[in-house]
C-alpha cells in the first residue's frame, strides 16, 4: 500500500520541493491539480495548507507530511515527529503598536488579531488579559492600531513587524519545518519502513548540504604528517598515485576527506602548509553515515 504524504503549500513549499528533489523525488505538478507525481509508485502526494497537515495525519487519512511545529501546537494534533528539517525558522510572537504601554493593556478588554487562535488564547489567559480574538487569514500585522490592540503572529526576523510600527512584547514558541507521521502509519510495518527510509534520505541530503569533499595529492615523504592533520567524518580515503618513472618514494597518494563547509577557509591553507597539492573542492549530494 502506498505511503500517503502531505506537502505544504505556501512559503514552506519551495524548501520541501528542493529537499524532495535532492532526495531523488522530483515533484511533477501542473496548475490544475493538488496531487503531484513524485515518480515513485510507493508514494501518493497531496498538497495542502500547512495548517491542516497535523489534523489530517491525526485522522489517519494521510500517513506523513511536512509542517511547522507551530501548526501542530495550534491544532493540538497528536502526531509523531520524525525529523526536524531545520528550515523556515520562525517565532510565534506577541506584538503591539510601538507606542503602546503594555501594562495598561491589562486594564481593559483588548482585541487580539491572529491566525493562531489556540496559542493566543492560552498565552492571554496565562498572562491575565481580558480579550476578544479576531481570526485573521494572513497580513495580521496590518490590523493594529485601528482594528486590534495586539497581534499574535509568526516572524522570521521581526523586520515586517517593525516596518508596520509594532514591537514584540513576548515569544510563545519557536518553530521550524518538521517531518511528521501519523501514529497509525507507524503501527503498519510497511509504512513505517517507508517513513524511516524517507527520513534517512532527508538526513543524507541535509548532512550533505553542510559538507564538501576535498581531494588532494601528497608526496610520500609528507603523507604521514598530512594524514595526522586531517579532519574527516571517519577516516580519509587514500589511494596510491601512479608513478610512471618508478622513482624512489613512489608516486605519492591521493587523499579524499568530507569536511564541514565552514571549516574550508581555514583548512585549505593548513593543507597546503602540510604539503598537499592539486586540492579540489566539490559539493556532495547525500551523506549516509
Predicted regions and their residues:
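Small-molecule-sensing regulatory modules
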Residues: 2-42, 47, 66-80, 84-91, ...
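Short, structured active-site "lid" loops
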Residues: 42-63
Amino acid at each position: 500500500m502506498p505511503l500517503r504524504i502531505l506537502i505544504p503549500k505556501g512559503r514552506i513549499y519551495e524548501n520541501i520541493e528542493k529537499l524532495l528533489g535532492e532526495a531523488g523525488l522530483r515533484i511533477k505538478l501542473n496548475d490544475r491539480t493538488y496531487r503531484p507525481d513524485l515518480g515513485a509508485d510507493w508514494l501518493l502526494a497531496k498538497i495542502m495548507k500547512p495548517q491542516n497537515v497535523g489534523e489530517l495525519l491525526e485522522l489517519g487519512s494521510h500517513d506523513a507530511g511536512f509542517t511547522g511545529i507551530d501548526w501542530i501546537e495550534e491544532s493540538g494534533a497528536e502526531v509523531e515527529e520524525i525529523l526536524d528539517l531545520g528550515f523556515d525558522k520562525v517565532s510565534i510572537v506577541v506584538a503591539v503598536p510601538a507606542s503602546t504601554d503594555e501594562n495598561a493593556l491589562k486594564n481593559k478588554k483588548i482585541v487580539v488579531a491572529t491566525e493562531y487562535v489556540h496559542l493566543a488564547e492560552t498565552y492571554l489567559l496565562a498572562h491575565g488579559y481580558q480579550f476578544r480574538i479576531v481570526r485573521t487569514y494572513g497580513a495580521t500585522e496590518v490590523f493594529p492600531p485601528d482594528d486590534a490592540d495586539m497581534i499574535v503572529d509568526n516572524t522570521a526576523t521581526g523586520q515586517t513587524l517593525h516596518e508596520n510600527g509594532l514591537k514584540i512584547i513576548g515569544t510563545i514558541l519557536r518553530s521550524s519545518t518538521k517531518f511528521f507521521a501519523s501514529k497509525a502509519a507507524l503501527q503498519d510495518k510497511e509504512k513505517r519502513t517507508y517513513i524511516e527510509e524517507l527520513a534517512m534520505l532527508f538526513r543524507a541530503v541535509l548532512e550533505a548540504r553542510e559538507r564538501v569533499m576535498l581531494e588532494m595529492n601528497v608526496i610520500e615523504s609528507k603523507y604521514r604528517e598530512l594524514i595526522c592533520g586531517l579532519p574527516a567524518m571517519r577516516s580519509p580515503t587514500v589511494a596510491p598515485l601512479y608513478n610512471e618513472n618508478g622513482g624512489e618514494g613512489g608516486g605519492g597518494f591521493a587523499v579524499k576527506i568530507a569536511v564541514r563547509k565552514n571549516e574550508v577557509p581555514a583548512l585549505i591553507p593548513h593543507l597546503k602548509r602540510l604539503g598537499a597539492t592539486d586540492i579540489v573542492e566539490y559539493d556532495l549530494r547525500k551523506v549516509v553515515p
